[in-house]
Amino acid sequence: MKKVFEYIATLLLLLAVGTSCEEGNDNWKVITAVPTGLYITGDATIYSAAATSSQLTTPAFDNAPEGTNIVGIYTWLKSSGSFTMLEVDSEGNEINYGSGESVATTPAPTYRLTVGGSPFTVAKDGLYYVAFNKADNQLTVIPTDFGIIGDATPQQWNDETAMAGALNEAQATVEYTIKDVTLDKKEMKFRYLHNWGVDIPYQGATVKMHSNMGAVAKGAISEAFSECKGGGDNFTLVKAGIH
């Protein structure tokens, strides 16, 4: 069967994880006067200091209650180092949070945050979603091993077909790719954790964050760049074959 090469995969997760400090590279800028907010710092990260790309922001929730006070970040973490969370208040005061007691282990480890606590670590290099629950002062560290799912893929809508993730330092991206996988001329999405959402402990219950990436608008995948968003529409493949 003739191989068909398309730019489907690359969920290219243009997550702007930012590894370059070249002048003019907006993916990575060291901040000298750190604005109010929450940041991830440490040698497990790809940031040498607080940076625009290391600030936590509101995630794509799946029907979470209005006012849910969780922020987070997709970021590459290294098993050889450690990280802490930096909070900067409106007066410029900085507070470093480390790990306290374990709150939950599934679907991902959740810890109570402690001022000056032990730094966090991960068992293997990879892309993670780090969620800071500001209401309960907790941190959830979620591995995001993306795959593809859908009737265009080998496992249909039953489960993900694994992709290989790698940090591209030169391009300041995390790239997920597949090779020699037969895909049909149908629909697919990107997903991790074998579920459509991940439950994050919150206020004695949980809130769900999308663990699937779809299209910003329904349409076919082409060889051009296609933007993804949490919980977005299905992508449509226009060519069947080995990808």
Write out the residue ranges for each language-model feature.
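Insoluble glucan recognition modules
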Residues: K2-T10, G18-H243
